[in-house]
Design a protein with these regions (language model features):
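Transmembrane alpha-helices
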Residues: 89-105, 140, 194-226, 273
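Residue-level hotspots within pore-lining transmembrane alpha-helices
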Residues: 89, 131, 135, 144-148, ...
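Short hydrophobic alpha-helical segments within the ABC transporter permease transmembrane module
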Residues: 83-85, 92, 127, 134, ...
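Gly/Trp-centered helix-boundary motif
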Residues: 1-107, 111, 118-119, 133, ...
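Generic hydrophobic transmembrane alpha-helix motif, especially the helices
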Residues: 70, 74, 80, 104-108, ...
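Short helix-capping/hinge motifs at transmembrane helix termini and TM-loop junctions
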Residues: 44-52, 114-118, 143-149, 161, ...
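Glycine-rich helix-loop "coupling/hinge" segments at transmembrane-helix boundaries
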Residues: 144-146, 158, 173-174, 222-265
Length: 290
């Protein structure tokens, strides 16, 4: 095929996907909300200095939201607005990094299983079946309990809990793509396996994988918040949203805003990723739309 025609077809496909996505109002709402949250995380130091979130002021303990403290203060007199703004970095970093790690590791394993099959595929998938038999939250708890509660171990635990689903998804998509005639043609011309996988298999399998990864970020953020809430994730005084909820438990009746505000932030962030993921799914394959 002429390179110019091939380039035109790719551009046309991209424009069609973008058009479908832009027509989806809920997806656009999710995208706007997500961009707003990402902008807050990126510009956190410009919006409010981090020091305001760690300075303790005993005189201003449990101050309700007002003009001086937009979100009020906590039990140590720390500015909750500053802690929420800078906490967005923790939650987004955990959600995005764990999803990308699971995608890279799970994508590599799943691609090899789907492309080669055989004994390697059987052995890996039986191991993944064992991991999937354990609920993701319990698996994460077990890993954190074994390694210790901190940010690094939380990332490891959530990535491991996400791996089985990623491996199975990538494997199933790669098996479907690998059965196409152009893959057999590439093999018959003596193409190396790595080149075939990277040039033909991966690009044609990216649609479902991108959608799944986008939507998994929301699950990862919720998992991290849940583990931090029970003291098995990010530890205080780090302002991760789940850790903020954990700190607020003891004073939930005296200062309920300490629970409501981080909870709403977690909800809106997870919702934005889910809406964008749904929109991408419908744009990439309109047949999947309900």
């Amino acid at each position: 095929m002429d390179p110019e025609i091939k380039k035109y077809k790719k551009e046309s496909q991209f424009k069609e996907i973008r058009r479908r996505f832009k027509k989806n109002r809920t997806a656009m709402l999710g995208l706007v909300l997500l961009c707003f949250i990402l902008l807050i995380a990126i510009c956190a130091d410009i919006i409010v200095p981090y020091q305001k979130g760690i300075i303790q002021n005993g005189k201003d303990r449990f101050t309700s939201p007002n003009s001086s403290y937009l979100f009020g203060t906590d039990h140590l007199g720390r500015d909750l607005f500053a802690r929420i703004i800078h906490g967005s970095r923790y939650s987004l970093f955990i959600g995005i990094s764990t999803s990308l790690l699971a995608l890279v590791i799970g994508g590599l394993i799943g691609s090899c299983c789907g492309y080669y099959g055989g004994a390697f595929d059987n052995a890996v998938m039986r191991f993944m079946d064992v991991l999937m038999s354990v609920p993701p939250v319990l698996l994460s708890l077990a890993v954190v309990a074994a390694l210790g509660p901190n940010l690094r171990n939380l990332l490891i635990a959530i990535t491991i809990s996400c791996l089985p689903g990623t491996v199975r998804l990538v494997r199933s998509v790669v098996i479907t793509v690998a059965d196409n005639d152009y893959i057999e043609a590439a093999r018959s011309y003596g193409g190396r396996d790595l080149r075939i996988i990277l040039k033909y298999v991966v690009p044609n399998a990216m649609g479902p994988i991108i959608v799944s990864t986008t939507m998994s970020i929301a699950s990862m953020i919720l998992s991290a918040a849940g583990l931090s809430f029970i003291g098995m994730g990010v530890q205080p005084p780090s302002p991760e949203w789940g850790a903020l909820l954990s700190e607020a438990r003891a004073n939930m009746f005296r200062a309920p805003y300490l629970l409501y505000i981080p909870g709403v932030c977690i909800l809106l962030t997870a919702l934005s990723f889910n809406l964008v993921g749904d929109g991408l799914r419908d744009a990439l394959d309109p047949k999947l739309k309900d």
